[in-house]
């Protein structure tokens, strides 16, 4: 449980800092060495905040500028293929 507490405190500290921070040495040296880090000149370590979640898909502009009757014709796409529903 002690490691979990340390992790929570670190997360809080990291949130108070800017999104990109240069570090003197890696927080987890074992993991850094597995990724190719060596403690000698020429290696720099940064902590970078990464946004969580999936890919943000851009909203098509067409839906903003279409009149409401036409908007009914446009249906959300399924598996990337756009489906048009025509009123009769």
From Swiss-Prot:
Which InterPro entries does the record cross-reference, listed alphabetically? Rbsml_eL15_core_dom_sf (IPR024794), Ribosomal_eL15 (IPR000439), Ribosomal_eL15_CS (IPR020925), Ribosomal_uL23/eL15/eS24_sf (IPR012678)
Q: Which PROSITE patterns match?
A: RIBOSOMAL_L15E
Q: Pfam families attached here?
A: Ribosomal_L15e
The record's section on Gene3D superfamilies has: Ribosomal protein l15e
Q: Name one GO cellular component term.
A: ribosome
SMART domains on file: Ribosomal_L15e
Report a single Gene Ontology molecular function.
mRNA binding
Output the SUPFAM superfamilies linked to this UniProt entry. Ribosomal proteins S24e, L23 and L15e
- Entry keywords, A to Z: Ribonucleoprotein, Ribosomal protein
GO terms of biological process kind:
translation
Return the similarity comment.
Answer: Belongs to the eukaryotic ribosomal protein eL15 family.
PANTHER family (UniProt xref): LARGE RIBOSOMAL SUBUNIT PROTEIN EL15Y-RELATED, RIBOSOMAL PROTEIN L15
State what protein this is by name. Answer: Large ribosomal subunit protein eL15
Gene that produces this protein:
RPL15
């Amino acid at each position: 449980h002690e490691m979990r507490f340390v992790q929570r405190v670190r997360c809080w500290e990291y949130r108070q800092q800017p999104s990109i921070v240069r570090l003197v040495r890696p927080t987890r040296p074992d993991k850094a060495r597995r990724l190719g880090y060596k403690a000698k000149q020429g290696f720099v370590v940064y902590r970078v905040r990464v946004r969580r979640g999936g890919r943000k898909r851009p909203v098509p502009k067409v839906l903003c500028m279409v009149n409401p009757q036409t908007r009914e014709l446009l249906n959300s796409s399924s598996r990337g293929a756009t489906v048009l529903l025509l009123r009769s």
